């Protein structure tokens, strides 16, 4: 199991398209560079959920 990254943590949101061409659905991935570069942290169906997850991930008080 990966170790917890030290603070300050930084994450970024990547928009991806899932599904067959012409029938895609947009998903939002939360990614960080711990434990490896471009590690997938979580996936979310809305941009707002991804932003909320990013805030929680980066907030040391949410530990």
UniProtKB/Swiss-Prot annotation:
Residues 51-63 have a biased composition (Basic and acidic residues). Residues 35-63 are annotated as: Disordered. Gene3D superfamilies: YaiA protein. InterPro entries: YaiA, YaiA-like_sf. It holds the Pfam family YaiA. It comes from the Bacteria. This is Uncharacterized protein YaiA. It comes from Escherichia coli (strain K12).
